[in-house]
């Protein structure tokens, strides 16, 4: 109903003109670095609106979630994966690695690789900070990186691989006030092989049963001062980033690419991230409750309507009446 009312106050008109394709591939001011800086500037300006104070109050450290998603496309410019299709083109993909501040739920760092690139390469891009804890899936397991994090006093939580080799050096007691889902809390040592030099790294391994998913998980971490159930709870925060990727793929799908090289694709993906960020800011700043999908649909339909967006979204009926009277 709101979108229909907005149509009645449209005072801009589109004229039939020949569509000129913008060259995303070669436009100097619109290269990926420029767009990524714009994304960062918007996040810095409006991050306080997106921030969830409950997470900040519960944790003394800055929690950052790391994950990746693969965007499939028929490409020859990136390293190809999979079989060739009927038309002879190889199905390639670009993988988007993102870092999300747990209290903001929008990417603060994005890095692109070919779909075939191993996830753990992204860990080299992360900034080490003694006040930060990174949370990532087991696809990012890299003992060399874990040793570097530990030496730099940077925390991490991840899942251990099924085929991981380790030695249990200590079994910690589980206090009565610890969540009953904690099944074990152990100190382990793993072997780190860095350029032929082998060392031992001490880590913490926690086994936890999650009632919601009805399965057990094994986590490894270098957080020796945290409660075992807190470490398990930290990892559960990581599932927020999966919801972000799902939200983008459902509401802002990259079905069509406007250029045929890596530069153009990166720019287009960054534009989607910026749109997602701006809509998130609008949604969070409104008193009236809007679902994200309805908000996206509204903006898509009325992109060329001349209306005060936030004013209209707060009270569509009232704003429509005022505009029709004028």
Regions of interest found by a model, annotated:
Residues 1-46, 53-62, 66-79, 84-326:
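Single, function-defining residue in the core of a domain
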């Amino acid at each position: 109903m709101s979108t229909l009312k907005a149509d009645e106050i449209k005072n801009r008109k589109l004229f039939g003109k020949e569509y000129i394709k913008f060259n995303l591939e070669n436009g100097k001011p619109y290269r990926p670095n420029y767009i990524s800086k714009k994304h960062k500037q918007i996040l810095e300006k409006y991050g306080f609106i997106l921030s969830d104070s409950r997470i900040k109050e519960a944790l003394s450290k800055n929690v950052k979630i790391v994950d990746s998603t693969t965007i499939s496309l028929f490409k020859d410019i990136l390293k190809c994966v999979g079989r060739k299709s009927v038309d002879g083109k190889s199905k390639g993909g670009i993988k988007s690695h993102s870092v999300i501040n747990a209290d903001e739920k929008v990417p603060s760092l994005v890095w692109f690789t070919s779909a075939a690139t191993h996830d753990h390469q992204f860990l080299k891009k992360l900034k080490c900070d003694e006040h930060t804890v990174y949370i990532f899936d087991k696809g990012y397991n890299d003992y060399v990186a874990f040793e570097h994090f530990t030496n730099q006093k940077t925390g991490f939580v991840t899942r251990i691989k099924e085929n991981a080799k380790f030695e249990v050096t200590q079994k910690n007691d589980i206090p009565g006030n610890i969540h009953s889902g904690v099944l074990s809390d152990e100190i382990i040592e793993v072997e780190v092989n860095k350029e032929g030099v082998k060392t031992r790294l001490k880590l913490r391994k926690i086994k936890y049963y999650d009632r919601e998913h009805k399965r057990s998980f094994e986590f490894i971490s270098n957080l020796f001062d945290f409660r075992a159930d807190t470490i398990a709870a930290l990892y559960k925060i990581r599932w927020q980033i999966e919801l972000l990727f799902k939200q983008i793929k459902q509401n802002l799908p990259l079905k069509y690419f406007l250029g045929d090289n890596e530069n153009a694709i990166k720019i287009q993906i960054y534009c989607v991230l910026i749109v997602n960020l701006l809509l998130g800011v609008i949604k969070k700043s409104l008193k009236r409750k809007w679902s994200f999908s309805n908000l996206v649909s509204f903006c898509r339909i009325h992109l060329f309507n001349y209306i005060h967006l936030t004013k209209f979204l707060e009270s569509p009926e009232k704003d429509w009446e005022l505009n029709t009277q004028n």
